């Protein structure tokens, strides 16, 4: 089935109202895109943040009279003479197949591979984690996830417990188990993350060694030899008392989700209790690791 798309330049204040109206007049989907390549960081739980200059992109059936759509947008005040817009035909494709073709097995460190379930494992003798993009907040493609996976691959995890604080998809906890950890514990504020982690652990045959808790339900006095938290700089600093208490004496801590420009402030929050290693940067992101003093 072919489609036609309209792209409107808007603002964060107007974008959601325009989106609602486009759906009312027949759009089958509406998405938002940054029109100026401006990053957004640290939305609050349940919050949708938009860019100052936001493009609203609506998809319609190819038979739609797009001039009528433009007229309706003008009548409702969503489109004026100063609003840039573009209408274009969208080639019909097997979108599911194209999406799947974009994901390939990825290697992290010396031993670890993350592989989509529909792909053949490149090295059956390696440590292979099968994980599909989708529900999961982290599949190895983001630099912060990659930095954490490489760090875990470089540790001796045999017989140790690993806590994945802000577990999302569970990718870090599952990787730790496959790399030899005795037990892993995933903690998150989002019930959907707990569900995703459980499903991914079952797919990888490690569900019996993974304990999962919502943040408010985690047991008191929980500690582990290795703690990894791939969240964001603000929460990492705010939750320093909580995260630092999870690390056993002489235990290892790995932090990411941090912009390189934020590394200094995060290091300042943790350096009193941890001997920190050199910050490792990738693209605009970084990883901070250290040992509890």
Curated annotation (Swiss-Prot):
Entry EC no(s): 2.1.1.-
Record CDD domains: AdoMet_MTases
GO BP field: methylation
UniProt entry keywords in alphabetical sequence: Cytoplasm, Methyltransferase, S-adenosyl-L-methionine, Transferase
Chain's role: Methylates ribosomal protein L11.
Family named by the database record: Belongs to the methyltransferase superfamily. PrmA family.
Protein name listed in UniProt: Ribosomal protein L11 methyltransferase
Species for this entry: Mannheimia succiniciproducens (strain KCTC 0769BP / MBEL55E)
Lineage: Bacteria, Pseudomonadati, Pseudomonadota, Gammaproteobacteria, Pasteurellales
